[in-house]
């Protein structure tokens, strides 16, 4: 277990396309969010689940369920909240990413430097599977206040250690770690790739 990093799982999405709460969708005998938690528990004993309704995730033992500080529907709110709960670098992941490979997480943590360490896949940053330093808090607040509340815009204002797609494929050849679930069909499709 690694105590040099904390983990924050963002569970604040609305699951509109999923038609139900995807974080609680059961496959392989457990809710999706529990798959994410179990993958990441080997990296830190400090795992937080950030959501608008923290009581919903109290069933996950060893996780700390916390409420989003800001009352806005935006993933930057979860990142902002994370900055208040830790003083060390932290891994941020989406609750709808149940196929994360441990080797990829390990690679990211080992290569973390600057304000953020983020993979760039197919020309786009992957901010919901990345390592951040809590010092980014003020820049997040500025982005939200200036109505530039998107991860892609925020990243342009951060000092980022960019990891390449080639580096990602060296530890996750199918890039399954970056698959986020939006429909029940996604679960089946990505499950078949990951197993």
From Swiss-Prot:
Primary location: cytoplasm
Residues binding Mg(2+), per UniProt: 96
GO molecular function: GTP binding; metal ion binding; molybdenum cofactor guanylyltransferase activity
Compartment(s) where it occurs, according to its Swiss-Prot or TrEMBL record: Cytoplasm
InterPro entries named among the record's database cross-references: MobA-like_NTP_Trfase (IPR025877), Molybde_CF_guanTrfase (IPR013482), Nucleotide-diphossugar_trans (IPR029044)
Positions contributing to GTP binding: 10-12, 22, 68, 96
Pfam families, per database record: NTP_transf_3
UniProt cofactor(s): Mg(2+)
Stated name of the protein: Probable molybdenum cofactor guanylyltransferase
Species this chain originates from: Hydrogenobaculum sp. (strain Y04AAS1)
């Amino acid at each position: 277990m690694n105590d040099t990093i904390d983990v924050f799982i963002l569970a604040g999405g609305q699951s509109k396309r999923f038609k139900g709460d995807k974080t609680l969708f059961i496959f392989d005998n457990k809710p999706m969010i529990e798959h994410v938690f179990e993958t990441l528990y080997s990296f830190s004993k400090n795992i937080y689940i950030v959501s608008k309704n923290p009581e919903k995730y109290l069933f996950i033992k060893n996780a700390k369920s916390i409420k989003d500080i800001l009352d806005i529907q935006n993933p930057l709110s979860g990142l902002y909240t994370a900055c208040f709960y830790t003083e060390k670098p932290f891994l941020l992941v989406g609750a709808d990413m149940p196929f994360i490979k441990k080797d990829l997480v390990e690679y990211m943590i080992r290569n973390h430097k600057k304000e953020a360490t983020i993979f760039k896949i197919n020309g786009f940053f992957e901010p919901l599977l990345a390592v951040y330093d809590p010092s980014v808090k003020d820049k997040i607040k500025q982005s939200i206040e200036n109505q530039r509340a998107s991860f892609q815009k925020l990243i342009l204002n951060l000092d980022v250690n960019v990891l390449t797609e080639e580096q990602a494929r060296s530890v996750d050849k199918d890039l399954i770690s970056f698959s986020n679930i939006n429909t029940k069909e996604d679960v089946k499709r990505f499950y078949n790739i990951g197993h």
